[in-house]
């Protein structure tokens, strides 16, 4: 028996349920880059909905996934056992549990393997997993940061080993494009290609918020990053 097709993964996901459960409805469905309107570079809604598995018709998509599984020799009488590996933190375990539950809908019995933090990235680098669920963030919502860091050949964080020389040329091209409108269209094409190539399946983008006491002064929140304002060199307490 040949290995089951990975194409089933495109069709099984109910992405909205991840957002409803994990983010209380606060989140967006998109590609690699931060979706609109929160992000600057996200694909237009029409491009997103045209991606395989993104139509929103979960029932129809899962029927397609079941058909792919049956074609590979799996079904109600022969379910596929799969280990889902993830980091042993709640923000990783919770979506992994939802993924396992959704796997059941198409005849896959998932078993959760939790990995301690010190071993998680080495495990990803070695590709020592069948299905790995990872939570990914980037310092700045910018294509150069995201594409070069995660997807070009030989990138240190290209954990899935995706390598397409034509893709790398497209990334270089958008980086050198001085016209912001033209660059944005190139970025959309690149992101669309990543999702079609199944380079690293994206499930959801959740929103994050920051709270602070009134006596905290001098804190400037970043408009395109969750992480780049935490040096606190200008922050003081008015007490």
Which residues does each PLM region occupy?
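Cysteine-centered nucleophilic/redox motifs
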Residues: 9, 16, 92-108
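Paired acidic/hydrophobic, glycine-rich loop segments that form the ligand-binding mouth/hinge
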Residues: 130-135, 202
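Beta->alpha turn/N-cap motifs
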Residues: 15, 34, 117, 134-139
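Short, well-ordered beta-strand elements
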Residues: 79-88, 111-113
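Short helices/loops that flank or line small-molecule/ion binding pockets
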Residues: 97-106, 118-129
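Extracytoplasmic/peripheral linker and loop segments enriched in polar/acidic and small residues
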Residues: 3-7, 11, 19-22, 31, ...
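Structural transition elements
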Residues: 29-71, 89-94
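Long beta-strand-rich cores associated with HINT superfamily self-processing modules
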Residues: 210-239
């Amino acid at each position: 028996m040949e290995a089951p097709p990975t194409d089933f993964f495109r069709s099984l996901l109910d992405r909205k349920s991840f957002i409803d459960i994990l983010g209380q409805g606060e989140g967006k469905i998109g590609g690699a880059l931060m979706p609109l309107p929160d992000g600057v570079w996200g694909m237009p809604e029409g491009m997103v909905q045209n991606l395989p598995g993104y139509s929103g018709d979960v029932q129809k998509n899962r029927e397609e996934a079941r058909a792919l599984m049956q074609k590979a020799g799996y079904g109600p009488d022969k379910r596929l056992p799969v280990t889902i590996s993830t980091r042993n933190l709640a923000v990783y375990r919770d979506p992994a549990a939802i993924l396992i539950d959704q796997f059941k809908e198409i005849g896959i019995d998932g078993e959760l393997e939790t990995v301690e933090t010190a071993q998680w990235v080495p495990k990803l680098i070695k590709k020592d997993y069948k299905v790995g669920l990872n939570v990914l963030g980037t310092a700045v919502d910018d294509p150069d940061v995201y594409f070069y860091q995660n997807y070009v050949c030989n990138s240190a964080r290209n954990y899935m080993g995706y390598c397409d020389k034509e893709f790398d040329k497209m990334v270089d091209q958008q980086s050198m494009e001085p016209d912001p409108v033209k660059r944005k269209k190139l970025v959309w094409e690149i992101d669309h290609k990543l999702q079609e190539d199944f380079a690293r399946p994206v499930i959801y983008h959740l929103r994050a918020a920051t709270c602070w006491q009134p006596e905290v002064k001098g804190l400037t929140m970043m408009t395109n990053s969750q992480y780049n304002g935490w040096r606190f060199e200008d922050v003081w307490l008015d007490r």
